[in-house]
Amino acid sequence: MISIITTSYNYSEYISETIKSVLAQTYSEWELIIVDDASTDNSVEMIKPFCEDKRIKLLCHDKNKGLAKAIQTGLKYAKGEWIAFLESDDLWTENTLLERVKAIESHPQIGLIFNDVEEFGEKNSVLAVKNNLDKVRQKLAKMEFPRNIFYDINIENLLLTFSAVMVKHDALKKCSLATPIDALLDWWIFIHIAYKNEAFYINKKLTKWRQHKNSYLYNKNKKAYRSVNISAYIDIWKIEKLGTKFLPFILKTVVLTVFKRGTKFYYVVFVRKIKKLLGIKLKPSPLFDD
């Protein structure tokens, strides 16, 4: 069975359509866990009628706790071997789960599945993401799957949106959800799962990614991604108890990043943040320090 977790917060205009896209799935062995994070609109009233289907469960927070806490609440009730994420403003095509199950059957060793997306919604918002999505697709087309994508995604994001991802439940249980930036919980999870698990990419537009100005996407920026990257490395180091193995672990990522983005990016992003997070005293660089 697949457990689908949808977090809800003031998306009453979209949530019904999102739920209907789950009900339309050709693969029927699923449960949908909706966690409403104290919406102030009529989201809960929109969701309740769908709970007549016993596969759909609604959980409500009495106060707003944020995305990470909402996901944690959903995971407490999840029974599936796999966890799929579907944001409350996105949609799936009718064969989304079926295609993912086929991938699992063909590659049982994988721990992460992701697929291509169809962007839709506000015209300007769609145009804003189109070029970047096309570049990512070109890169993915040159890669062979299944593969471990940990170092790939630390150089640049290859996972298009949260609603396009499904992860193995056992792998997710080992993942800390203590992201320093709530809006980037998806990125935090991707890094953790990718560290020890192979991924498989489905080159089909199985997720419909809605673009609008109230989306989480518009609360994200490059500096935030970098901060989450480093924090995730430290978290993995602690969870996996890497000890002295941490140095080659971080060194490989540093070398790849220097090669890709240059020395200044390495110093500002990696050295400074590792210094801050680990309390390591490093001599300032007159070349790069502001």
What is each of the regions a protein language model found here?
Residues M1-I2, L23-I34, N42, K54-K57:
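Short loop->beta transition adjacent to catalytic acidic/histidine clusters or analogous donor-positioning motifs
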Residues Y11-A24:
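Short, well-formed alpha-helical segments that are part of the catalytic scaffolds
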Residues S16, D41-P49, L91, N95:
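Acidic helix N-cap motif at the loop->helix transition within catalytic regions
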Residues S21, S28, D36-E45, K63, ...:
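A conserved acidic beta->alpha catalytic loop
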Residues H61-A78, E99:
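Glycine-rich, basic loop-to-helix element that forms the pyrophosphate-binding segment
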Residues L67-K69, L97-A171:
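Flexible acidic/His/Gly-enriched loops in nucleotide-sugar-dependent glycosyltransferase catalytic domains
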Residues K76, V136-K222, N229:
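Conserved nucleotide-sugar donor-binding catalytic segment
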Residues I83:
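Short aromatic/hydrophobic "clamp" motif used to bind/position activated sugar donors
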